[in-house]
Amino acid sequence: MASVLSYESLVHAVAGAVGSVTAMTVFFPLDTARLRLQVDEKRKSKTTHAVLLEIIKEEGLLAPYRGWFPVISSLCCSNFVYFYTFNSLKAVWVKGQRSSTGKDLVVGFVAGVVNVLLTTPLWVVNTRLKLQGAKFRNEDIIPTNYKGIIDAFHQIIRDEGILALWNGTFPSLLLVFNPAIQFMFYEGLKRQLLKKRMKLSSLDVFIIGAIAKAIATTVTYPMQTVQSILRFGRHRLNPENRTLGSLRNVLSLLHQRVKRFGIMGLYKGLEAKLLQTVLTAALMFLVYEKLTAATFTVMGLKSTHKH
């Protein structure tokens, strides 16, 4: 119990949250482009650069940062939960011994499940706020009119029921493999490098963070597309119950996507996603590692986690 409620786990959680918020703020416009490509299927522009120019031209210079606050709020909570759970479970299971690839994957998966169940409502709301006011090419999308985060929660619960806040939970649960795979490769690559040197450089951390995220994103991207569509939940031609995003709905969306756009339709927006997530993850891990190390140094503490 002491390992779960330790100061060390809290330091890792705060550092992870700060790192993710910093990185997402820097690369937020890339995430805006990715989301438009996933949700607005009839948009003709295919590249990140073209979509961003379109958004700025049609909706204003600050449009790529629309929905920044709810996204950052959700991301901060989400990463705090994930890093806290990951490091607490690792401390309990590993108990000062060296970890392994298998243990990192299992701990990452469990941390991901906890994170999804607790924070999905925040992501549903921020997805809708981020897309509110966007000029869609798809006429099947029903516009929203939320005044803010609280009003969005109120309207969704009033009009669609409280379970609508967990739209897309099923694909989100499948997607816990994304951070699990990411952390498995990240921790594994760190272990390999630390066998050859005493300390990792900033460039080392940036590169292994980028590699780990690139692998995880490419493997799980089709499910991320389905997740975005279900969270948005404003398509007129999707009348069936989207709550929790059942396996049937997930398979149906995957089938429709392939039927309309071919197999590459499952990877629409991947360029923007890779560009954004790889750079974001790399910067996030860099800030996280530096902040964690600095905190332990200032407080005169020594990390009990062994990689």
Curated annotation (Swiss-Prot):
Subcellular locations according to the entry: Cytoplasm; Peroxisome membrane
Solcar repeats: from-to residues: 7-92, 99-192, 200-294
Motif (Peroxisome localization signal) on chain: 190-199
GO BP terms, alphabetized: ADP transport; AMP transport; coenzyme A transmembrane transport; FAD transmembrane transport; fatty acid beta-oxidation; fatty acid transport; NAD transport
Catalytic activity: AMP(out) + CoA(in) = AMP(in) + CoA(out); 3'-dephospho-CoA(in) + AMP(out) = 3'-dephospho-CoA(out) + AMP(in); acetyl-CoA(in) + AMP(out) = acetyl-CoA(out) + AMP(in); AMP(in) + NAD(+)(out) = AMP(out) + NAD(+)(in)
Chief localisation class: cytoplasm
Residue ranges, annotated region (Necessary for targeting to peroxisomes and interaction with PEX19): 1-147, 244-307
Record-linked InterPro entries: Mit_carrier, Mito/Peroxisomal_Carrier, Mitochondrial_sb/sol_carrier, Mt_carrier_dom_sf
GO terms, molecular function: ADP transmembrane transporter activity; AMP transmembrane transporter activity; antiporter activity; ATP transmembrane transporter activity; coenzyme A transmembrane transporter activity; FAD transmembrane transporter activity; FMN transmembrane transporter activity; NAD transmembrane transporter activity
Pfam families recorded: Mito_carr
Residue spans, topological domain Lumenal: 31-66, 126-160, 224-280
Top-rank taxon: Eukaryota
Tissue: Expressed in liver, kidney, heart, spleen, muscle and lung.
GO cellular component: mitochondrion; peroxisomal membrane
Topological domain spans for side Cytoplasmic: 1-9, 88-104, 182-202, 302-307
Free-text comment on this protein's domains from its UniProt entry: The N- and C-terminal portions are exposed to the cytoplasm. Lacks a typical peroxisomal sorting signal. A region between helical transmembrane domains (TM) 4 and 5 and TM1-TM3 or TM4-TM6 are necessary for the peroxisome-targeting activity.
Family of the protein in this entry: Belongs to the mitochondrial carrier (TC 2.A.29) family.
PANTHER family: PEROXISOMAL MEMBRANE PROTEIN PMP34, PEROXISOMAL MEMBRANE PROTEIN PMP34-RELATED
Subunit-level organization: Interacts (via N- and C-terminus peroxisomal targeting regions) with PEX19; the interaction occurs with the newly synthesized SLC25A17 in the cytosol.
Descriptive protein name: Peroxisomal membrane protein PMP34
Organism: Mus musculus
Phylogenetic classification of the source organism: Eukaryota, Metazoa, Chordata, Craniata, Vertebrata
